[in-house]
Amino acid sequence: MVPRKDYEEAIEFLKENKINYKEIEYKPLEIKEFKENRKDRCYYCKKKLMSGIKEEANKNGFKNVLDGKNEDDLKVYRPGNKATEEIGIISPLAEIGFSKENIREESKKLGLKIWNKPSNSCLATRFPYNTILTEDDLKRVEQGEEVLKKLGIPKVRIRVHQEIARIEVEREYSNVIIQNQNIVEQIKALGFRYVTLDLNGLTSGSFDK
């Protein structure tokens, strides 16, 4: 459940580096626990997703499936980790103690143009737990965040509280939001009644606090 732009950039990366790939249809909103946005939704989502990938891999003669989990992912709330362990997914980066920063450093050495791509997260994390998720709600969050990214703000989160859009950006970009009234109008046009800026700045796992 990632922004369309992230998906397109991933496909572009694979093609540029001549990496063979196969797309598998996956609809997380059909998973009851995910749609209800339960606190352990990631467990159910990751289990179905990775089970499907492993099944497809086995069909094509591959014994093992690796993921990109890193050491930092082991230090925060990640219910999906339990699912991958149960399925037998291998996480080599986490096993050797590679952090996000280590990955960026090595990616830069390899000349990968995505080495400094800002991290992102599942769009479901923008909503309070136990909020029913819909395609429309996820889409308007994606569109709202894209409005801000076009202004040169690299990391953005729009947290949804019913009619309120709570914007989280790194504090150094706060003035970009405050000085651009047009942002408010564009985000309101997506269906929000109020648009606010969180003075705490960007907070990973905001609804886990």
Residue ranges of each PLM-predicted region?
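Proline- and acidic/polar-enriched loop/turn elements at helix boundaries
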Residues: 26, 69, 118-119, 160, ...
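Short alpha-helix boundary/capping motifs
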Residues: 42, 85-86, 134-136, 176
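Short secondary-structure transition/capping segments
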Residues: 34-37, 77-80, 127-130, 168-170, ...
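Peripheral terminal appendages
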Residues: 142-209
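Non-catalytic, surface-exposed connector residues within folded enzymatic/regulatory domains
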Residues: 36, 117, 177-178
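Mid-to-C-terminal catalytic subdomains of enzymes
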Residues: 94, 98-100, 104-148, 155-156
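ATP-dependent adenylation/nucleotidyltransferase module used to activate substrates
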Residues: 1-109, 150, 165, 181-192, ...
